[in-house]
Amino acid sequence: KEAGCRFCGACIEVCPTGSIMDQVKIMKENRSMAENIVPCQSACPAHIDIPRYIRYIREGEFDKAAAVIREKVPFPETLGSICNHACEGECKRNELDAPLSVCRLKRAAAANESGAWKERVRREPATGKKAAVMGAGPAGLTAAYYLAKKGHEVTVFEKNPKAGGQCRYGIPAYRLPDRLLDREIHTILEAGIELRTNTQPQSPDQLLKQGYDTVLVAVGTHKGTRLPIEGSGLPQVYVNTDFLKQARLGTPLPLSGRVMVLGGGNV
């Protein structure tokens, strides 16, 4: 059936007679074999095995699908809500009709899994090594999660009251609800990670002197960029990141009278 074709082009490569012709140029000359065969996975920054977890979803195996996603990222439901899904832009189904909804499928896998995958998570024996992570945003927590699975003792330091980084303080709750983010952070910490909020180490050297074997700096990019125009530094001209963070903290910046917003994107 035509609808059953994922438009991956694999049949062209393995056909022993050459009878299957690449008439629409599925295989691009300027791409590697991996990029041609599974372009969605190649386009994904985390290189998640997208075809495999979609196959599990189709079979109703949501736990297996979630486990495949968590091989690469510990935030499947968060990504399913806010990912910019570069994979969909490279989906071979674009050549036929429309791309698969990879991002929403990722969220469906995370929302419907039972948590049974936790029983099968492999954790290597304790190494005796201590790792410190500065910043409890998505990068810091992801690193902490996989370091813990490697058997290292991990402590995460976060200067804000709660973990989450830009996911919590830079994205409005209507796009990424706190309950969803809290649930995934809780799952990450269950790997045996210690989280210290409202704590800001002076420097990586300070942590090394305290006995940590290695330090990862994952403080994020919370500083916004002002437009290079006259008056951008005047009082009551606010940068988007500052405004969003203060709003999420419940202390919005003072506004009155007429308000102008420069920029028509999501922010």
Predicted segments, located by residue:
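Glycine-rich FAD pyrophosphate-binding loop
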Residues: 152-168
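Rossmann-like dinucleotide/flavin-binding elements
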Residues: 134-157, 196-211, 223-225, 242-267
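Extreme N-terminal leader/targeting segments of oxidoreductases
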Residues: 93-129, 183, 210, 237-240
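Ferredoxin-like iron-sulfur electron-transfer modules
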Residues: 1-7, 20-43, 64-85, 117-134, ...
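N-terminal Rossmann-like dinucleotide/flavin-binding domain of flavoprotein oxidoreductases
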Residues: 66-73, 84, 105, 166-212
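Glycine-rich beta-alpha-beta "Rossmann" dinucleotide-binding loop(s) and their flanking helix/strand
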Residues: 215-217, 221-244
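Short amphipathic alpha-helical segments
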Residues: 55, 145-146, 168-169, 227-231
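Iron-sulfur cluster-binding cysteine motifs and their immediate structural context
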Residues: 10-27, 39-59, 80-109, 155, ...
